Swiss-Prot record:
Cofactor mode of binding and number, as noted: Binds 1 FMN per subunit.
Function noted in UniProt: Catalyzes the oxidation of (S)-lactate (L-lactate) to pyruvate, with a reduction of O2 to H2O2. To a lesser extent is also able to use glycolate as substrate.
MF GO annotations: (S)-2-hydroxy-acid oxidase activity; FMN binding
The protein's name: L-lactate oxidase
Binding residue positions for FMN: 85-87, 114, 135, 163, 237, 259, 292-296, 316
PROSITE patterns listed in its UniProt record: FMN_HYDROXY_ACID_DH_2
Gene3D superfamilies referenced in this protein's UniProt entry, alphabetically: Aldolase class I
Record keyword Phosphoprotein present: no
Family membership noted in the UniProt record: Belongs to the FMN-dependent alpha-hydroxy acid dehydrogenase family.
Record flagged with keyword NAD: no
Reactions catalysed: (S)-lactate + O2 = pyruvate + H2O2; glycolate + O2 = glyoxylate + H2O2
Active site (catalytic residues): 261 (proton acceptor)
Length: 365
């Protein structure tokens, strides 16, 4: 089905776009976007972690001067909701990342463009506002990674987001059952100029994981090289272990994104939200810490902020909104998330993001 580029009836909350997405996408494409790896245990865990907390309402609080403005990495943002890097957005809409970039600009959101985008990083930058970051997958050849860095710098991206948790992505059971295959028009536009090596073929007796997929996986020397190769701040995405957080902070990372890659890398990994308090303790107050994984509402964003995040990234929900209503849908989804966050803050007696602390939550069971 083709997207309508209008807001359909029945969208009352941001999460309604998830409900409507199967009507706007064919079954295979939807299964690819919605699924994680294995049995989707981590996908479910991300959502369940938010359900494990309830927001405590407060009475008689004056929030008439309330707002959600914040400073993040030198940017003045109107709200703490960013668009996460999501690959192959032409699966959802012919305008792909150009549409999400326009939505981010319209709502003042920071867009994080993916290395594996359907549109080039230059075209995405031209359609976006000044708040834009570039997500990087290190390439097998350093010269190609360096060229991506230089292109991002030249296109005005404000930061690099290095993803480290996706060297292995096992197939989605749902996508396999739906017979999904990547369409010919869903190429990784940024990588078109770089020759791609043939998949590693392990020798007899070797592992297709250890000696195959992990052959080009990033290591500490790659991170040190990257930090020395760009003038842009480098954020690290895919952090779940507190010791990794401490080591990355000490190495010079500008900030960390607590993430399990939406459950697409390791089925059985803990929910991002579950690990957030431990990572905040590990890096201390004041060090930038973001979260993605399972955010579907302004209440979810509130809970993440209360548990230690400075902001959250929205992944699948942006693709669902894109599929249903194009750029207008993504902008509408973001606006609804912001309004849901405003309502949650007001009910909890929080006039500023800094008022959202751990004691605004209570276990829900």
């Amino acid at each position: 089905m083709s997207p309508s580029d209008r807001i359909p009836p029945g969208v009352w909350n941001a999460i309604d776009y998830e409900r409507l997405a199967p009507q706007a996408m064919d079954a295979g494409r939807h299964a690819y976007v919605a699924g994680g790896c294995g049995w989707d245990a981590t996908v479910a865990a991300n959502r369940a972690a938010f359900a494990g907390w309830a927001v405590l309402p407060r009475l008689l609080r004056d929030v008439r001067a309330g707002h959600t403005r914040l400073q993040l990495a030198g940017m003045d943002l109107p709200h703490p909701l960013l668009l996460a890097p999501v690959a192959h957005q032409r699966l959802a809409h012919p305008d792909a990342e150009i549409a999400t970039a326009r939505a981010a600009q319209a709502t003042g959101s920071c867009l994080v463009a993916s290395t594996l985008s359907s549109c080039t990083l230059e075209d995405i930058a031209a359609a976006s506002g000044p708040a834009r970051w570039f997500q990087l997958y290190l390439q097998p050849e350093r010269e190609h990674s360096l060229d991506l860095l230089r292109r991002a710098e030249a296109a005005g991206y404000r930061a690099i987001v290095l993803t480290l948790d996706a060297s292995i992505q096992l197939a989605s059971r749902g996508a396999l059952q739906a017979g999904f295959a990547m369409p010919a028009d869903c190429v990784s536009a940024n990588l078109a100029r770089y020759p791609q090596p043939a998949p590693a073929q392990p020798a007899a007796g070797e592992s297709r994981i250890f000696q195959g997929a992990m052959r080009h996986a990033p290591r500490w020397d790659d991170l040190r090289w990257l930090l020395a190769s760009t003038r842009l701040p480098v954020w690290i995405k895919g952090v779940l272990h507190p010791e990794d957080a401490r080591e990355l902070q000490a190495a010079g990372a500008a900030g960390l994104i607590v993430s399990n890659h939406g459950g697409r890398s390791l089925d059985g990994a803990p929910a991002s939200l579950r690990m957030l308090p431990a990572l905040r303790t590990a890096v201390g107050a004041g060090y930038p810490l973001l979260l993605d994984g399972g955010v579907r509402s302004g209440q979810d964003a509130f809970k993440a902020l209360a548990l230690g995040a400075d902001a959250v990234l929205v992944g699948r929900l942006q693709v669902y909104a894109l599929a249903v209503a194009g750029a207008l849908g993504v902008a509408h989804m973001l606006q609804m998330l912001v309004e849901e966050l405003h309502a949650c803050m007001a009910q909890a007696g929080c006039a500023r993001l800094s008022d959202i602390t751990h004691d605004t939550l209570t276990p829900s069971c």
